[in-house]
Design a protein with these regions (language model features):
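Bacterial Sec-dependent N-terminal signal peptides
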Residues: 1-22
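N-terminal extracellular ligand-recognition/capping segment immediately after the signal peptide
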Residues: 64, 79-125, 131-134, 153-154
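Conserved small/polar residues in nucleotide/adenosyl-binding loops
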Residues: 434-439
Length: 439
């Protein structure tokens, strides 16, 4: 009885401690961010095992219609869990409906078709704009409470798309990312209280995980991978957070040939006035491991407002940039209250800020919108890198209220922090650097 009482008190104290943690702007972090129980499919309704409904284990047989029929059956009968058993199942675009969930058992593989005609063109969201484009392999729109779980794998089968992209780029060097027709792996939109846990998301033809206009999304213990060699997988961002709030990314491994965590939201000279766009707020990325990627945490390039963003307790190995602020001269942007702390490992650049001019277009706007990045804190960081401070001065944006606190940096290049670039730059405690000289 005494032990039980002690346990209860300890638990209450632990929850109280968590509840006192704050976002960078001082707001208390809600308890929701600390409740991370894994999905129990037994509490989600009837299980619909796809092989009970005519779907067979065959990696070469396209079975989109049969798998979709199981989803529709579940939806029409009060909802439930679509279960994919051990084996490999080839499919085009699948559309989940209210009350339905997806679970991949161990050694199960949902394999995407490498024929773009198996992904219908729909009204969707892509690269900061709402437009008609190809559906993803897994599409979840207006499905509150959706879960994707299990120890299986979603394989985008992207190599054919990647090779085609690079061939097009050789012939048309200025082609856009969307000119080469290819699907995303997972697109979740207008859905709240979503959880994606444990699965492996690999070899996406385009963006891997894209969430748009969602509230309360947890991405837990995912393994997200696309190769950087021998064939580079272009634009395969691990997680794109697009006009969302209350998002937790925890315990994930990410290694992709683009940005790992990319904060999106819109682009263009009037992007902040378009109701289809929006900011990202109250985002926590913690306890993750990052392999090769262009940016661990990237604001942009299609982004207008990011507020209360935390990246903490993460390990890096071969990432190019830790914090990358892409400043578009054709888009009004505000990146504020961003905290990066307790980071270890190696990276090419710790903080990278520069104008992003790819596909620059002011349209009919006469003046160039000025963007702002402020209240950016980096603390308790121990990294080996090529350079720490890669920040360009520009009239296109204003930087203010940055804080570097307790940084231990081993750099190949001299570490020079130009305090004239950032207004109200604060250097706290020991900021120690070791310059590795060539022998």
């Amino acid at each position: 009885m005494i032990k039980s009482a002690i346990l209860i008190v300890a638990t209450c104290c632990s929850l109280q401690l968590f509840s006192q943690e704050k976002f960078p702007d001082g707001k208390i972090i809600p308890d929701w961010f600390y409740k991370n129980e894994k999905t129990d499919i037994n509490g989600l309704g009837k299980n619909f095992l796809i092989t009970d409904y005519g779907v067979v284990n065959d990696s070469t047989l396209l079975q989109t219609e049969k798998i979709q029929a199981v989803i529709d059956l579940a939806s029409n009968n009060g909802g439930g869990v679509i279960v994919i058993p051990e084996g490999t199942y080839l499919s085009g675009a699948l559309f989940f409906k209210p009350g339905t969930h997806l679970h991949l058992e161990k050694k199960a593989v949902l394999k995407g078709s490498d024929d773009i005609s198996n992904f219908p063109v729909i009204e969707t969201r892509m690269e900061g704009q709402n437009l008609k484009y190809f559906s993803a392999l897994i599409n979840v729109d207006k499905v509150d409470g959706f879960t994707l779980s299990g120890k299986g794998k979603v394989d985008g089968n992207g190599e054919r798309y990647w090779k085609s992209f690079w061939l097009r780029r050789r012939v048309i060097p200025k082609c856009t990312n969307m000119d080469e027709l290819r699907p995303r792996l997972l697109h979740i939109s207008h859905s709240n209280n979503v959880q994606v846990s444990d699965v492996r998301l690999v070899n996406s033809p385009f963006w891997t995980t894209h969430i748009y206009k969602c509230d309360s999304v947890k991405l837990l213990n995912l393994h997200i991978f696309s190769p950087s060699f021998p064939v580079k997988a272009p634009s395969t961002d691990a997680i794109d957070i697009d006009a969302c709030k209350n998002v937790l990314v925890k315990g994930c491994y990410m290694s992709v040939n683009d940005d790992a965590i990319a904060l999106k939201g819109g682009k263009g000279p009037w992007a902040d006035q378009d109701p289809d766009n929006g900011g990202n707020c109250d985002i926590i990325i913690e306890d993750c491991t990052f392999g090769f990627c262009h940016g661990v945490l990237t604001c942009g390039s299609e982004s207008i407002y990011n507020h209360n963003i935390i990246l903490r307790r993460c390990n890096l190995d071969q990432a190019k940039r830790l914090l990358w602020l892409k400043m578009r001269p054709d888009t009004p942007q505000q990146y504020k209250y961003i905290l990066v702390e307790d980071i270890k490992g190696n990276v090419r650049n710790c903080i990278f800020i520069a104008p992003w001019t790819q596909f620059y277009d002011l349209k009919d706007r006469k003046d160039m919108p000025v963007s702002y990045s402020s209240y950016i804190t980096m603390r308790n960081i121990h990294l080996d890198c090529d350079s720490f401070f890669a920040v360009e001065k520009s009239k296109q944006y204003k930087l203010s209220n940055f804080c570097f606190d307790n940084l231990t940096i081993t750099a190949k290049k001299d570490v020079k922090i130009d305090e004239n670039i950032i207004d109200a730059l604060v250097m706290r405690k020991a900021v120690s650097y070791t310059h590795l000289r060539a022998h």
